[in-house]
């Protein structure tokens, strides 16, 4: 069932999302050659706790870390460890924080030093596709309108959409309905209403 939040719940979620976004920004600042993914994860863990929140990913379905850090060909759900970042890597960091019983969840991809023009284009197109999708996150539109916009933009720039993973609702649980694919025909799926919280998570491939 799709959960629509009331104003009190939205305020709590805004706080949770601000903490999550700040944790993601911290991770991005640490992406540089010579740093291990475990070091980034530890810093994010400590920051989230310092904000009175808890790392949502840690222990979720047995996941052993506070972040998902995926490098280069790894699409999502990379487990932090002793891998050392090197020049030219592209590094996706996914973070979740729970505060007041509600969850924030966000991700971004960062360049480690100088990267190839193709890798930079991948990052740029993926980020812009997120905003293209958000343009259709409006009351009365259909969920599939978002994915259609994302897919159309990405494919127009020579990339493909990863269909195995989708965005999702978020709230008291990290994964709530509805699913938000990054592809599809417009005009399908549930209609969006005010105070529906969902996460659009564009993932791309060369």
Predicted regions and their residues:
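Active-site cores enriched in adjacent His and Asp/Glu residues with nearby glycine-rich loops
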Residues: 21-87, 136-178, 190-194
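A conserved acidic, glycine/proline-rich C-terminal tail/linker
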Residues: 182-188, 204
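Short, Lys/Arg- and Gly-enriched loop/turn segments at beta-strand edges
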Residues: 99-106, 204
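Generic structural signal for buried aliphatic residues
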Residues: 91-93, 196-198
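Short, compositionally biased
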Residues: 104-120
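N-terminal glycine-rich anion-binding loops that anchor highly charged ligand groups
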Residues: 12-24
């Amino acid at each position: 069932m799709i959960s629509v939040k009331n104003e009190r719940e939205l305020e709590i979620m805004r706080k949770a999302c601000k903490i999550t976004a700040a944790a993601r920004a911290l991770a991005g600042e640490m992406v540089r050659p010579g740093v291990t993914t475990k070091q980034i994860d530890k810093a994010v863990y400590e920051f989230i706790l310092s904000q009175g929140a808890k790392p949502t990913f840690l222990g979720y379905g047995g996941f052993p870390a506070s972040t998902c850090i995926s490098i280069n060909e790894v699409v999502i759900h990379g487990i932090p460890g002793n891998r050392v970042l090197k020049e030219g890597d592209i590094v996706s960091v996914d973070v979740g924080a729970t505060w007041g019983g509600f969850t924030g969840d966000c991700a971004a991809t960062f360049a480690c030093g100088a990267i190839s023009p193709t890798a930079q284009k991948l990052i740029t197109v993926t980020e812009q596709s997120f905003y293209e999708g958000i343009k259709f996150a409006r009351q009365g539109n259909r969920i599939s309108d978002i994915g259609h916009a994302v897919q159309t933009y990405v494919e127009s720039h020579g990339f493909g959409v990863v269909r195995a993973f989708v965005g999702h609702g978020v709230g008291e649980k990290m994964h709530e309905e509805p699913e938000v694919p990054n592809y599809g025909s417009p005009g399908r799926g549930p209609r969006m209403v005010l105070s529906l919280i969902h996460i659009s998570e564009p993932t791309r491939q060369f």
